[in-house]
A protein has these predicted regions:
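N-terminal secretory/targeting leader peptides
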Residues: 1-200
């Protein structure tokens, strides 16, 4: 079967579909792809993938499904934190929030630029998405694993139920906000380009 470097929950899902899941350190990924040790690798986004050179040894770039968002964490010993004066706690909290905001914005910007470069500079790379059939199978396996984990772990169940409830609300707003904007402005741009070309 397909030999795929994909860790954690995404790896569990892929494994249920018959994929041979591997976990390989980042420093060995390029060579593993080049030598055929693995057939595919899940990493991050264009701003991380292209600098690692994956486009040189892999001709297909699939859009992701397993990580709709990333979570950035900082772990501080509670006793150490409580010993800090309040002003230093405030400074640290503000600094962490600013660093997260900067990282998110910088990554978004770099992804925009590099995604455009992929299409122009690397014509060998074919951008694909999984078929509806594969997505349904991935969804089914995902739901099964989530249900199993919820039965075994009350904390997991509580967190997952909370996330599901928020996701239902978030989807509604995302469709109204982001999707509607992209859809409507895309139509306007297409119409303007069509008119500018002299066709009506």
């Amino acid at each position: 079967g397909l030999k795929f470097r994909i860790p954690s929950f995404g790896g569990e899902v892929m494994s249920r579909l018959g994929v041979a899941v591997a976990t390989i350190p980042v420093g060995e990924l390029y060579m593993a792809l080049e030598m055929g040790t693995i057939d595919a690798v899940e990493w991050a986004s264009p701003s991380f993938d292209i600098p690692l050179g994956f486009h040189k040894v892999a001709n297909y770039y699939y859009t992701g499904w397993q990580e709709p968002a990333s979570e950035q964490q900082i772990v501080i010993n509670l006793q150490t934190w409580q010993k800090l004066p309040k002003d230093l706690q405030n400074i640290l909290e503000a600094s962490i929030a600013k660093a997260r905001e900067y990282a998110e914005n910088e990554t978004f910007y770099k992804n925009v630029i590099i995604w455009d470069e992929i299409k122009k500079k690397y014509p060998n790379v074919q951008i694909r998405s999984f078929s509806p059939e594969i997505m349904r199978a991935l969804r089914k396996a995902t739901d099964e694993i989530l249900a199993e984990e919820s039965e075994k772990n009350p904390d997991f169940k509580e967190i997952w139920e909370s996330q599901k409830a928020f996701l239902a609300k978030a989807r509604t707003w995302t469709k109204m906000g982001d999707f509607t904007y992209i859809e409507k402005t895309g139509d306007v741009e297409a119409e303007q380009n069509f008119t500018a070309s002299g066709k009506k």
